[in-house]
């Protein structure tokens, strides 16, 4: 499925976004489950979308390790990128792949690596930004809470002032103070949800 907008509402480089198509897959699965009489056939269509993602959105790096491209043109072109409002890090959370999936693991390693343009891996707030706001995003911290980096994310939360304690779009990578998007209400809601989900995992582990 084609789109010209990324999760930030910025225009995409190529027309087919991996993350957006995963959302299409998830929505079709949900509709088929909730309304089987009306939309049961969407289960087959969802599987077709899933197969298409693996067929067209997976590439290999210089070491031949597979990873998910961010956007593709179906002609072999793609870009390596991620956006905190709709991150490839959330694929296991949506049930698209397992947390130990090799392709997903390689993808996450690439976008969290110090060499990635919008990674702040070496900073106290070691989250990810994007072109829309090139600082660590609070939504990236939410993604960390949901994708296996909850210990790091909780530590970062303790260091952040944000917008006087209110969730904002992005923060300074060292100070944790608001840099863009003060009083970001939808971000605050997702942060609460992510913290709750991560806390459940901690309590179950105990």
Identify the residue ranges that each predicted region occupies:
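Extended ligand-binding clefts on enzyme/binding-domain cores
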Residues: 1-25, 40-139
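Inward-facing hydrophobic residues that define packing positions of alpha-helical scaffold repeats
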Residues: 28, 108, 154-158
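A structural signal for well-ordered alpha-helices, especially hydrophobic packing surfaces
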Residues: 28-32, 50-53, 57, 195, ...
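Inter-helical turn/loop segments and adjacent helix faces that build the functional surface
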Residues: 30-43
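Short, flexible helix-adjacent loops and helix caps
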Residues: 36-37, 58, 172, 203
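C-terminal capping/lid segments that line or modulate ligand- or cofactor-binding pockets
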Residues: 78-98, 134-206
